């Protein structure tokens, strides 16, 4: 089962409101999801703190267990709208392995 972190559209016509959800990639866009981890309201001003609200610990958890984020969610992360204190565990393991390999060579 491929799991994605994506936006699910809610709200009314011409008044979009999105939930940031973890869902099976085969599920419909607005259909069943595993967990709601945040929300995005594009109608709010860009400087409003409630425009994008995400549970960062749950986002980190899902990324660490292999969930793939969609382009828009990745954009939120890259722009600093959603902050991740540390990289996912897979990256940390590679760094430790690289440091061990360099230590053995020297």
UniProtKB/Swiss-Prot annotation:
Any single GO CC term annotated in Swiss-Prot or TrEMBL for this entry: small ribosomal subunit
Protein name as it appears in the record: Small ribosomal subunit protein bS16
Family: Belongs to the bacterial ribosomal protein bS16 family.
Keywords recorded for this protein, A-Z: Ribonucleoprotein, Ribosomal protein
Source taxon at top rank: Bacteria
PROSITE patterns in the record: RIBOSOMAL_S16
Stored NCBIfam families: S16 (TIGR00002)
One Pfam family per UniProt: Ribosomal_S16
InterPro entries named in the record: Ribosomal_bS16, Ribosomal_bS16_CS, Ribosomal_bS16_dom_sf
A Gene Ontology molecular function term of the record: structural constituent of ribosome
Record PANTHER family: 30S RIBOSOMAL PROTEIN S16, SMALL RIBOSOMAL SUBUNIT PROTEIN BS16M
BP GO annotations: translation
